[in-house]
From Swiss-Prot:
PANTHER family: HEAT SHOCK PROTEIN 70KDA. The gene is hscA. Belongs to the heat shock protein 70 family. Chaperone involved in the maturation of iron-sulfur cluster-containing proteins. Has a low intrinsic ATPase activity which is markedly stimulated by HscB. Involved in the maturation of IscU. Keywords: ATP-binding, Chaperone, Nucleotide-binding. This is Chaperone protein HscA. One of its GO terms (molecular function) is unfolded protein binding. GO terms for biological process: iron-sulfur cluster assembly. It comes from Photorhabdus laumondii subsp. laumondii (strain DSM 15139 / CIP 105565 / TT01) (Photorhabdus luminescens subsp. laumondii).
Length: 616
């Protein structure tokens, strides 16, 4: 089945009319655009027959320069030449400056704390920079295909959160594009290989690009791609190989520091050339700033080994999350230019126990997969049997009384997905309910990540437990979360789309998962205590209300017994023993059973007053 078989608004559904769609790999270091022509996916080249476009934009008086020309000027005009902007997408300025303290740009914060970069043409943000890169790719595509595009599929790292995905969508809209879908990069690579081979089983996608590392464990079964688990590092890639090599060259040559941005750019360019050379040769020459030297492949491999180990640790975590062993992995797909490094291929093959797949150019494979998906989504392949199922990396839920987390969608649930659950009011006459959306694996809200808050108002003032509120969590195909709350009797509804103000790194995700495992028993104990305290508060609220209304139904001895049980429960709640609280609740319940029966009788008598038996 095709993911989409309906016509887009304004588009003809005529079967003979082929629509123009492309897949775009919006990368940290380089970007590409690909399309399907005559049944074959191909990357589109520029006028000089280059398929890669450096993800670099230089802003100067005459307007933005994009790609190769901008990259050439980076060493001479670093403050106005923006590169690796993907790392800034969806992050706050404070987060960026903490993660990347040596960036040569003049930053200032927007009203909501997001980064603005001061350039020769004024202030720009990461969305604007990404939009300019997209415009260049679209211009290439439309000139090559001789027509306007009907839609695009843009790839993003699997670990991009809501804010980063939304920023990518905003950049595309700013470029005037109709986004058919955002697609995880590893999933796009699986399309590129999986459709051709038709093999079934578990595959691993190892994606080491310029600025991000992603690993995905997928299962191919009867044409369905299901992502079992994802992992990675949003701040690790070939750029880091270049950086560590540039530092080595600087140390060997005894020149400058990272604060010399012009020299730093020259060093990084030289490091890139050396890295590429060492993929084929055992030794590489270095000539920079009047210094000449050499580096062997063994020396280079010693420098990058710690970085490769980090990728393999993330791969091991992903396998554990997917509940599969390395032996069960039938294929390993290599993605990203950095996988050309011989040591990377060797260590990955050693880790998974099999030779990784490299038959499709690792620079092109993501764009190729995206173009195949775009061709399907735009309606050119209505008979395709391919279906994609991505997953969410962390559980989504909301806060309940006592600071507890009620998980609505557990982590690694395939998306798109929608799940609903009913909740009720805690107090008599409650007319509003605060909805606090959280993300994480722990049992208490204080240990999870807050995503958003909103309030449902207009709840009818009924007794506690009388109103019924249906809360729905819906995650779309792009991983964006929509939460709605509906009061069933009145139809009153509140809604929010979750857009975190800054990104969540994979290190934080891994830490949150690890913490949930390490604190599992402690969390269970804390939850049990919190649940008993919530129940105690409910019982005390109910008993207090009943005494205020009908204390005259009790004699002094009965009143004293109930008061004593109430005091015992209040005292127990101040402690931290759930069993003591539970026993105090039971004791109060026992003391109030006769009182409850009398209240029921009294209520019935009042209801029947003035009515004859015949009327009843």
């Amino acid at each position: 089945m095709a993911l989409l078989q309906i016509s887009e608004p304004g588009l003809s559904a005529a079967p003979h009319q082929r629509r123009l769609a492309v897949g775009i790999d919006l990368g940290t270091t380089h970007s590409l655009v690909a399309t399907v022509r005559s049944g074959q996916a191909e990357t589109l080249m520029d006028s000089e027959e280059r398929y890669l476009l450096p993800s670099v934009v230089r802003y100067h008086e005459k307007g933005p320069e994009i790609g190769w020309l901008a990259r050439q000027q980076a060493a001479y005009d670093p403050a106005n030449t923006i590169s690796s902007v993907k790392r800034m997408m969806g992050r706050s300025l404070a987060d960026i400056q903490q993660r990347y303290p040596n960036l040569p740009y003049q930053f200032q914060a927007s009203e909501n704390g997001l980064p603005l970069i001061n350039t020769a043409t004024g202030l720009v943000d990461p969305i604007q920079v990404s939009s300019d890169i997209l415009k260049s790719l679209v211009q290439r595509a439309e000139e090559t295909l001789d027509g306007k595009l009907d839609g695009v599929v843009i790839t993003v790292p699997a670990y991009f959160d809501d804010a980063q995905r939304q920023g990518t969508k905003d950049a595309a809209r700013l470029a005037g594009l109709h986004v058919l879908r955002l697609l995880n990069e590893p999933t796009a690579a699986a399309i590129a290989y999986g459709l051709d081979s038709g093999q079934e089983g578990v595959i691993a996608v190892y994606d080491l690009g310029g600025g991000t590392f992603d690993v995905s464990i997928l299962r191919l079964s009867r044409g369905v791609f299901e992502v079992l688990a994802t992992g990675g590092d949003t701040a690790l890639g070939g750029d880091d190989f270049d950086l560590i090599l540039a530092d080595w060259i600087r140390e060997q040559a005894g020149i400058g520091s990272r604060d010399d941005h012009s020299l730093q750019r020259q060093l990084l360019d030289m490091a890139t050339q050396v890295k590429i050379a060492l993929s084929d040769a055992d030794i590489a020459e270095i000539n920079i700033a009047g210094w000449q030297g050499k580096i062997t492949r063994c020396e280079f491999e010693a420098l990058i080994t710690p970085l490769i180990k980090r990728t393999l640790l993330a791969s091991r975590r992903a396998l554990k999350d997917a509940e599969v062993s390395a032996d069960e992995v039938l294929q390993v797909v290599m993605v990203g230019g950095s996988t050309r490094v011989p040591l990377v291929r060797h260590r990955v093959g050693e880790f998974f126990g099999r030779e990784p797949l490299t038959s499709i150019d690792p620079d092109k494979v993501v764009a190729v997969g995206a173009s195949i998906q775009a061709d399907i989504l735009v309606g050119n392949k209505p008979d395709s049997d391919m279906l994609l199922l991505d997953v969410i990396p962390l559980s989504l839920g909301l806060e309940t009384m006592g600071g507890l987390v009620e998980k609505i969608i557990p982590r690694n649930t395939t998306i798109p997905v929608a799940k609903a659950q009913e909740f009720t009011t805690f107090k008599d006459g409650q007319s509003a309910m605060s909805i606090h959306v959280v993300q994480g694996e722990r049992e208490l809200v204080s240990d999870c990540r807050s995503l958003a808050r909103f309030t449902l108002r207009g709840i009818p003032p009924l007794p506690a437990g009388g109103a019924h509120i249906r809360v729905t969590f819906q995650v779309d195909a792009d991983g964006l979360l929509n939460v709605s709350a509906l009061e069933k009797s009145t139809g009153v509804e509140a809604f929010i789309q979750v857009k975190p103000s800054y990104g969540l790194s994979d290190e934080e995700i891994a830490r949150m998962i690890k913490d949930s495992m390490a604190n599992a028993q402690e969390d269970i104990n804390a939850r049990q205590l919190a649940e008993q305290k919530v129940e105690a508060a409910r019982v005390l609220e109910s008993v207090t209300s009943a005494l205020e209304k009908d204390a005259d139904l009790l004699n002094e001895q009965e009143q004293a017994a109930i008061d004593a049980a109430v005091e015992t429960l209040i005292t127990s709640v101040q402690g931290n023993d759930p069993e003591i609280i539970e026993n105090a609740i039971k004791q109060l319940d026992k003391q109030t059973q006769e009182f409850a029966a009398r209240r029921m009788d009294s209520s019935i008598r009042r209801a029947l007053a003035g009515h004859s038996v015949d009327e009843i």
